[in-house]
Amino acid sequence: FNTYYRDNDLYEVVAFTAAQIPDIAGRKYPAELAGKLYPKGIPIYAESDLTGLIREHQVDDCVFSYSDVSYTRVMNLSAIVHSAGANFILLGPRDTMVKSVKPLISVCATRTGCGKSQTSRKVIELLMAKGLKVVAIRHPMPYGDLVRQKVQRFATLEDLAFHECTIEEMEEYEPHVVRWNVIYAGVDNEAILRAVRRHPLALL
């Protein structure tokens, strides 16, 4: 949404759906993040409401944007969308990736629990051993105030308290902080990349 639809007046985004992470459905993607085309924000519904939303709003396109899912899961959702009468869209990298001006290594996986965090920390360890300064960027855990979570920077243990991190977030960020490795998170990757440009470093 942020990279392709937020400022694109050719489209009207009527809703997001949520799955896996609890307590997101029933909230709104706030106006402060949604941009000038959405002064009231954008409502977030449970994925189980998908078929009804398509019919209620006469939706033309449903854009799949979840992470950590299998091919089977994606195709099952495409069948649900098509049976409700909408197009099922997968945007490509040119429309979704944000250009980095720093050297960048990405660590990805098909599902939660594959070991992305451990792999990332090992890669950082190897790069730091070569004398490189590395900053980590992690996708957010959107449990709290999304506006406050636009750009989060963690460099000290005090930052964990300042950002009111959950136990899950602390488990993720603390291993970076205790070895003096800065980690960023947040819901706006473009804003995060602008924030880290001043660092003479590589990104993970």
Regions found by a protein language model. Give the residues of each.
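N-terminal beta-loop-helix "entrance" segment that forms/cooperates
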Residues: 19-41, 145-150
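Structural motif
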Residues: 2, 19, 64-68
